[in-house]
Amino acid sequence: MIVKTVKYKGFDGEDIEETIRLHLTKAEFLNLDLKYSDYGGLINYLRKLLTDVKDGDSYMRPMVTMLQTLILAAYGKKTDDGRFVKKVNGTLLADEFETSEAYSQLLIHLLSEEGLDEIEPLIMGIIPSDGVDPKELQAKKEQINAALNLA
């Protein structure tokens, strides 16, 4: 889990500081990693995008799309009993968060020149803290591909 604090002005001009919590379970990470398997997985695709954007060789659209996907998939809140939840009464918390100024500030900051250097550490903080063994992940991908006759 990673915790980010963003600051912004409220509608009445007041200063607001909001804490954002982002986390993916191993299953969520595996699902996202499979979506980017044509690029060598999520982390490899992220690194390629970062290199291309920093070198000026790429439009920002793929980076924006990836960040939106990851941030919204990982967004949730910590409960009083220490659990991390992404739904309340059947509603995804990310649905409301996506329209918030906090989300906007986080996304705009990450896409800024100084924010680009924060993207990889942010993503590495979102993935499961007990790590995802690359060999285990590859074996699971192969099992899924074999089951889907994609191997």
List each language-model region with its residue ranges:
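Structured domain cores in non-transmembrane regions
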Residues: 28-73
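Short, charged/polar N-terminal "headpieces" of proteins
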Residues: 1-47, 134-151
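Acidic-enriched, low-complexity/disordered segments with a strong bias for Aspartate over Glutamate
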Residues: 12-18, 33, 38, 52-57, ...
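Sparse, context-dependent recognition of short Cys/His-centered cofactor- or disulfide-binding micro-motifs
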Residues: 7, 56, 60, 91, ...
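C-terminal charged interaction modules
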Residues: 79-151
